[in-house]
Regions:
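Helix-loop interface residues and adjacent transmembrane-helix termini in multi-pass membrane transporters
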Residues: 29, 55, 82, 108-110, ...
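Membrane-interface helix termini and inter-helical loops of multi-pass transporters
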Residues: 21-29, 80-81, 85, 127-140, ...
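Transmembrane alpha-helical segments that form core, pore/gating elements
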Residues: 43-47, 99-100, 105, 137-194
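Specific alpha-helical transmembrane segments that line the substrate/conduction pathway
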Residues: 34-44, 77-110, 148
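Cytoplasmic-side transmembrane-helix entry/capping segments in multi-pass membrane proteins
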Residues: 57-67, 111-123, 141-142, 165-176
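Specific transmembrane alpha-helical segments of multi-pass solute transporters/efflux pumps
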Residues: 14-15, 19-20, 48-92, 100, ...
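Glycine-/small-residue-enriched transmembrane alpha-helix faces in small-molecule transporters
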Residues: 1-34, 134-161, 180-184
C-alpha cells in the first residue's frame, strides 16, 4: 500500500471516529431529528447546484432517503442522545455483518463458514462490550442505535443496486429528500427546536 493511500485511510478513519463525538455534542444542543434535518439541508444547499438530477432513478433515490437518510440517521441521532459516543461506535461495527446478511437475503450473494463465524463473533463481541456494567448508556437508546445500524444495512443493499448514480449525486438528492421528512417528524415528535 502506498503511503498516500495509507494516509487517506488513517484520515478517513479519524474523521469517522470524530463524527460520533461531534454528533454527541450536537444532540446536546438541539433535538436529534431537527439537528439531522439541518445537517441534510446544509448538504443539499451545498451539493445540489453541482450535480445533475438522476431523473430515471428518482424513486430509488427517494427510497434510499427513507432508509438511509430518515431511518438510519434519524434513529442514530436519537440513539446517541442517550448512549456514550464510544458505545455507539462499537455498536456501529455491526453495520458490516448486517450488510452481508442482507446481501445474502436480497442479492443472493453467498458467504462461507469463515465469514459466518466472523459474523457470529461480531455480534457476540458487540453484545459483550456494549453490555459492560458501568456504562451510563440507556439500553433503550442502545437498541435505537442498533435499529439505525439495521436500517444502514438495508440502505447499503439498496445503494449497491443503484450502480449508475455516483456517490456525490446520491448524497445530494438523498439529503434533499430526507430533510423535509425529518423536519416533519421533528415537528410532530420533538420540542425546543428554536430556543
Amino acid at each position: 500500500m502506498k503511503f498516500v493511500d495509507l494516509l487517506l485511510l488513517v484520515l478517513s478513519t479519524f474523521f469517522l471516529g470524530t463524527n460520533f463525538v461531534a454528533v454527541k455534542i450536537g444532540v446536546e444542543q438541539f433535538p436529534p431529528l431537527f439537528m439531522m434535518a439541518m445537517r441534510f439541508t446544509l448538504v443539499a444547499v451545498l451539493l445540489i447546484p453541482f450535480v445533475k438530477a438522476p431523473r430515471d432513478r428518482m424513486f430509488q433515490v427517494f427510497l434510499i432517503s427513507v432508509s438511509m437518510g430518515t431511518a438510519h440517521f434519524g434513529l442514530f441521532f436519537i440513539g446517541i442522545s442517550g448512549v456514550d459516543a464510544a458505545i455507539t461506535a462499537i455498536i456501529f461495527q455491526l453495520g458490516v455483518p448486517f450488510s452481508i446478511i442482507f446481501a445474502w437475503l436480497f442479492l443472493h450473494e453467498t458467504f462461507g463458514r469463515r465469514r459466518a463465524f466472523g459474523i457470529l463473533i461480531a455480534f457476540v463481541g458487540v453484545i459483550f462490550i456494549a453490555g459492560t456494567p458501568g456504562s451510563q448508556s440507556s439500553h433503550l437508546h442502545m437498541f435505537i442505535v442498533l435499529a439505525s445500524v439495521f436500517a444502514w444495512g438495508i440502505a447499503a443493499v439498496q445503494i449497491k443496486r443503484l450502480r449508475d448514480v455516483d456517490a456525490i449525486t446520491l448524497t445530494a438528492w438523498m439529503a434533499l429528500f430526507s430533510a423535509p421528512q425529518l423536519y416533519l417528524i421533528s415537528a410532530i415528535t420533538e420540542s425546543g427546536q428554536i430556543t
